[in-house]
């Protein structure tokens, strides 16, 4: 019986976390779910965010023998973890902006995240705790989330537009914390926009290590490679392109849970 790992995000950016976990635990059974009906999460109220994530995750936990849940969304992680941990009797892991490792290597740090993550008191508490003497500049962008989603279905990133978004940081930061799971997919483009000397840090590898630790390093009793399953909350006009993306990552075709935004 394989270990069942549920990875959840508002979009497909959480696949950056999936890749890191898959590298650590290649023989687990993966279920990926994303709430495209309410994408992007950065624009939801906390109560709606909690209600939606709890509903979708509970539904999938009743459908599969889930061993661990990974909230692969920084915005959701700052809000929903307490309620999910209270409701579920399995480990729930969230993602946290990698402020601590960034502060160990630089004092000119940029935190790139969604507008919601940038505004949360949780984010400021992280900076106060782990980078109290660093110059940490915050930049929130919903458009970057959209650009990452577009790239993953084959649409080229407009470097000129990206440079404009990142222009406040030109020559002002040397280390960027990628505080959204979508942003690792834009690493090459960010370096083109700000220069190759920029150090980019994300929390994907640390999350993967934590998941492996919580599962005691166990995966499956045999060496069978399991095909993952993927669920969305609403039909998508991009279904064909999405299926291509997921197929390359060893997932079956997209399935719809049918959970509209309103």
UniProtKB/Swiss-Prot annotation:
Classification via HAMAP family: Glu_racemase (MF_00258)
Protein known as: Glutamate racemase
UniProt cross-references to Gene3D superfamilies, sorted A to Z: 3.40.50.1860
Keywords for this protein: Cell shape, Cell wall biogenesis/degradation, Isomerase, Peptidoglycan synthesis
Pathway membership: Cell wall biogenesis; peptidoglycan biosynthesis
Entry EC no(s): 5.1.1.3
Membership in a protein family: Belongs to the aspartate/glutamate racemases family.
């Amino acid at each position: 019986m394989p270990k069942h790992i549920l990875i959840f995000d508002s979009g497909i950016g959480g696949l950056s976390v999936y890749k890191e976990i898959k590298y650590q635990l290649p023989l687990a059974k993966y279920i990926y779910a994303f709430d495209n009906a309410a994408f992007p999460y950065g624009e939801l109220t906390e109560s709606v965010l909690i209600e939606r994530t709890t509903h979708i995750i509970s539904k999938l936990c009743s459908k599969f023998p889930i061993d661990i849940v990974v909230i692969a969304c920084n915005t959701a992680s700052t809000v929903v973890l307490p309620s999910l941990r209270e409701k579920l009797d399995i480990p729930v892991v969230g993602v946290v902006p990698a402020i601590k490792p960034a502060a160990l290597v630089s004092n000119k740090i940029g935190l790139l995240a969604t507008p919601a993550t940038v505004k949360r008191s949780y984010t400021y508490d992280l900076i106060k705790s782990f980078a109290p003497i660093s110059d940490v500049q915050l930049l929130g962008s919903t458009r970057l989330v959209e650009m990452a989603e577009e790239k993953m279905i084959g649409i080229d990133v407009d470097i000129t537009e990206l440079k404009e978004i990142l222009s406040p940081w030109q020559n002002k930061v040397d280390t960027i914390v990628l505080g959204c799971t979508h942003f690792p997919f834009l690493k090459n483009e960010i370096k083109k926009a700000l220069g190759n000397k920029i150090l980019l840090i994300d929390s994907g590898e640390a999350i993967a290590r934590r998941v492996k630790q919580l599962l005691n390093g166990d995966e499956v009793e045999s060496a069978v490679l399991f095909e993952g399953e993927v669920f969305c909350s609403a039909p998508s006009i991009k279904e064909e392109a999405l299926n291509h993306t997921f197929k390359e990552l060893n997932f079956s075709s997209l399935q719809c849970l049918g959970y509209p935004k309103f």
